[in-house]
């Protein structure tokens, strides 16, 4: 689905590499076209051939109407037996880590079929630092599968039927980690759609 909005600009992100291993990122999302998405836009979606829906915490953070749209997306996905994957993707430029913010992101985490936090994000959201305890926390609240990203240590995964740690892919030199989480999510979702076990 592509919706055009002649009244608002497309959101953008610019990244400035200041020195090896470091960068500055600038976001231009306020009053973007995406921030005006609403429940009616979600209701117009044809979900008949969709296997999975993936979104991050950025989507509901950009406006109240986007948060409502995200809720409607989750609702419609569940009604159509579509797997919902949620990555909190915490961004200090968007979130203040207030109790209201944490409650909102936990709402989406607990309504997702698959939750993909980093260890640091999970600690912010639930106060736990042990990957298995984090997984148990969300599974006990309705999430079916939890995958905790552990950086160089790989990823911990748990569901009702499997549990373990997957190693990272070895690289001789890491130039930039931007987009690594998105790439990880894409691979994971592809595997889920193909019904490949997490382990």
Residue spans for each PLM region:
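Conserved beta-alpha-beta core of the PfkB/ribokinase-like small-molecule kinase fold
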Residues: 52, 58-137, 153-155
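Short, hinge-like loop/turn segments at secondary-structure boundaries
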Residues: 18-21, 101-105, 135, 162-166
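Conserved phosphate-binding/catalytic region of the ribokinase-like
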Residues: 75-79, 127-199
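A generic local structural motif
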Residues: 12-14, 38-42, 101-103, 132-135, ...
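Conserved N-terminal subdomain of the carbohydrate kinase-like
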Residues: 1-57
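Glycine-rich beta-alpha junction loops
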Residues: 7, 31, 90-92, 151-153, ...
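Structural motif
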Residues: 12-13, 23-26, 83-84, 114, ...
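Structured loop/turn residues at beta-strand edges in well-structured enzyme cores
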Residues: 45-48, 110, 141
């Amino acid at each position: 689905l592509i919706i055009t909005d002649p009244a608002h600009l497309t959101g953008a992100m610019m990244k400035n590499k200041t020195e090896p291993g470091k960068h500055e990122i600038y976001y231009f999302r306020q009053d973007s076209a995406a921030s005006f998405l609403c429940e009616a836009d979600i209701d117009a979606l044809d979900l008949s051939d969709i296997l999975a829906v993936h979104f991050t915490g950025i989507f509901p953070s950009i406006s109240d109407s986007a948060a409502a749209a995200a809720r409607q997306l989750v609702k419609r996905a569940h009604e159509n037996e579509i797997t919902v994957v949620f990555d909190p993707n915490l961004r200090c430029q968007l979130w203040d880590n207030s109790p209201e913010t944490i409650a909102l992101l936990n709402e989406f985490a607990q309504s997702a079929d698959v939750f993909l936090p980093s260890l640091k994000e999970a600690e912010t959201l639930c106060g736990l630092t042990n990957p298995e305890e984090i997984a148990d926390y969300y599974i006990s609240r309705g999430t079916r599968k939890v995958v905790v990203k552990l950086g160089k240590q790989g990823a911990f995964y748990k569901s009702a039927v499997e549990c373990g740690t997957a190693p990272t892919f070895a690289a001789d030199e890491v130039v930039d980690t931007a987009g690594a989480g998105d790439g990880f999510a894409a691979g994971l979702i592809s595997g889920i759609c193909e019904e490949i076990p997490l382990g």
